């Protein structure tokens, strides 16, 4: 049996479903580039029929990603499959992933069909997808709770119809490893044409079993594992791909399989997904948590000093977590900044060096020494900004005491600079009152978070907000050594996104009116 395990990432599809606010096309493309660097075999970029935004995201990713196969999801419905193919056709090669529910509860209560109808729908969907590509994946939704006879029948029929990958999801995270591995083993034993397809698994983490179930499936013969970076996803999340990759690498002698993952990209990819998705990583998270390589016990520290292997089964360097290099200061030139970015593995086309250097100089003037983690934070924030931002903060002054705070700002609105001052319950409240008055947007703030992005009193602070405007949620981010300024940047990030969305909607209306 082939010893290569295909890694199928669904961060941009299943993972995004867990987010408070949808990612922009630009943010999704950033993540797709990171997944490509990581060595992911298949990137599930979205569900094109679900919305124009998802269609555009899939199309953009399919156009730009060259070293990973781009995939789109569709129900077992012809219009879904047509939309997926239309979005993907800009790629040299692509995959269509179609699915239908197979468990008794789903068939009877959700689909309200007979099982014969479900099999026929699945077969029809696979055949229709094959008109567009030979690379068709078929999923039996809720396979973990599907009667085994029905599951075997569906798998055999889908393979006969032309599916080259059969995905067995534990959709509600119900099974345990021995049980799930047994399902995969039974398929290999009972489905006569099983050798004509790759068996894939897609496990959810409702009972904390997703990674263990996936490894059990690999031991039983599955050769594709689906999951997400940091395990993000519906409800309790998905199988964590960085954990799968490091388990296979660390226990290769036991498992006898391998992946094509570039393990030294794990840490960087994890941080990027956490940053853009506004989902902090728990400190004790396996592989990528802040405490993953920490040793506080005296006994453990003694052992580590004598021989690292006493308590360390893998190294921080193996996932790309490197020691801090020499610090940068305001006297450091562009070449020094570029050298640090090169050392961290970033390519020139992943960031704008001129913009990053200007942000670096401002930060260096404020805090003196700038560290690699500061540069990364500045780069991520710089990449989020748009060149055509309509609203820009030109000046900020805060007076705060024991009673009320006063904030004065100058805001560039297009080509016009406007001034405003306000009193509020704290400097951030006063600043937000100023911005609301000058922009005129009626925004409801759902969530406000402040996070330290560096170390020490002069470290960078990141503000993240979730805002609601006309029923749609927006995520805004700001970063600065001044948390009030960071908070203002976050709100302006949201307002600029709303402004762009309004402009696009207005242009569409004008086009419709002229037809």
Curated annotation (Swiss-Prot):
Gene3D superfamilies with a match to the protein in the record: 1.10.238.260, 3.30.160.270, Aldolase class I
Catalytic activity line of the entry: 3-methyl-2-oxobutanoate + acetyl-CoA + H2O = (2S)-2-isopropylmalate + CoA + H(+)
Cofactor: Mn(2+)
Gene Ontology terms: cellular component: cytosol
UniProt keyword list: Amino-acid biosynthesis, Branched-chain amino acid biosynthesis, Cytoplasm, Leucine biosynthesis, Manganese, Metal-binding, Transferase
Membership in a protein family: Belongs to the alpha-IPM synthase/homocitrate synthase family. LeuA type 1 subfamily.
Assembly and binders: Homodimer.
Entry protein name: 2-isopropylmalate synthase
